[in-house]
Amino acid sequence: MQYAKTSDGFMVRCEIGDEVIATLTKFAADHKIHSGSIIGIGALLNPELGYYDIHTRTYTRKKFDGDYELVSLTGNFARMGETTIMHCHAAFSDIEFRVIGGHLFSAEVAVTGEFYIRAGGTTIQRAPDPLTGLNLMKLQ
């Protein structure tokens, strides 16, 4: 991984073979980013996406084999207790220009992953929400 500090965050380039979520979450934790936002593009392998069913309160997960263009990744960082959490959604396109998207659980860098992390400058916590079954941001 390579990175450069900016006035309000970091530009990060993940290398071939890096697991995106693990690499970026560790980067945020190592740089004490306790809240922030992330956007990115690139080319990834074997993304695993999820769709949250609000009725069953469970994720349907699906792994897509092969390489895909990362058309757009957007998300955020927060804390769950003392642990840094990355929550992001992503859209991918295949060789036929079909687009798939959802909650990103995992993906490996195929060529490059280029990301901009904006540090929030504060700590945002997540906590279980009984209504949705999700770990939501607590902003009070």
For the regions a language model picked out, list residue spans one by one.
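N-terminal intrinsically disordered, cationic/polar leader segments
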Residues: 1-86, 91-140
